[in-house]
Structures are given as C-alpha cells and as structure tokens.
Amino acid sequence: GKSSISCLVIDDKTYDSAYGKLNNTFLHTTTYNGFGEETVTALEALNILSEPEFKNKVNQLSDLLSKKLTILKDNHSDKIEEVKGTGLLNGIIFKSYSSSLAEMVEKIPINLIKNKSFFLKKLTATVISAELYEKYNILTSINDSENSNHLNISPSLIIGNKDVDYFFSSLSAVLKSNLNLKTLDLIFNFIKSKLK
C-alpha cells in the first residue's frame, strides 16, 4: 500500500522568518494532494493515536527501552560513547574501539577520509548493524548523515517485551564479539569504491 501523508507544524514567528519574504523563502511544499485514500488513512492514524491503549503501549515501551539502553551502556561503557534520544526515538553512538583498525585507517590516504575519528565511529556502527542483520535477523539503520554516526534505535509499535529483550541480548552479544574481520572487509570495499 501507500501512505503519502505529510504535515508541517510551525509557530508564526518561525513561519514568518522562513517564508515571510519572497526573496529568502525555501518553500516547503508537497506533491501529495487530492488523494482521498490518504485522507482516510490519516484520519484512522489520528484515531489510533488518540486511543488510551496506544498511549499506554508507547509509554510502556519507552520506559523499557530507556532502562535497557542504560543497562547496555553501563555493561559496554568501553564500546558505547553515548546514548541519545527519548521515548521510542533513540540512537547509540559507539566508540571506535579497535586500536589495530585505528592504526590501519591512519594509513588510508587523507583525501579519501576527511575525519578519520568520525569515520571509525561510523564504521563501527555500520559493522554492528551488519552483524545484527546477518547473525540475528535484526534490521537496524545508521543515521546517513555526514554529521552523525549513530545506530538508530526506534522500534515499531507492534513489538513486545520479548522482542525488546531479543534485540538487546543480540546487540550485547555483537558488542562482546571480535568485529575486526568484518570491519576489515568493509574498509577494503570502501577503499575499492573510492579508487574506481
């Protein structure tokens, strides 16, 4: 199915500063309009969001996630630099915890990698995400920004406590494992792609 719903919520002051002058506007627009089924979908989503059971589920999952993230960070403080976020939208920033890989990355020509420390942290998150998928069938994402290197932790609302426990036990197992070979493979493929 499809669900092309969008919304912009903004206060008057911000709106005026962003859109108030024609010469400095960056026009926020959407191509989604005139689709009746999207209106029905949006209304049903609002109905679900307003149900007390939904709010209770979100609060319960948020509390559980917060506790599990704190425990994970405490148990792996040598590998986790920071846990960010709130509710069901969180991220884990990892340290680049392999000194041998750090030495190897230092030898990569500087023009291929602008910020080697950031690259190592993003590489670490990438390898952890790949291991979660390949070994535990858990699909995660890494923030795909030049300024961010965190593993996104934002579970679907259809999961239960057993799913949360499985995720954190799997992530803990990955953090206890030796990721050097997987990381070397990713570095090799990265360099190969840059030299083409």
Regions found by a protein language model. Give the residues of each.
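Conserved N-terminal phosphate-binding loop of PLP-dependent enzymes in the Aspartate aminotransferase
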Residues: 1-196
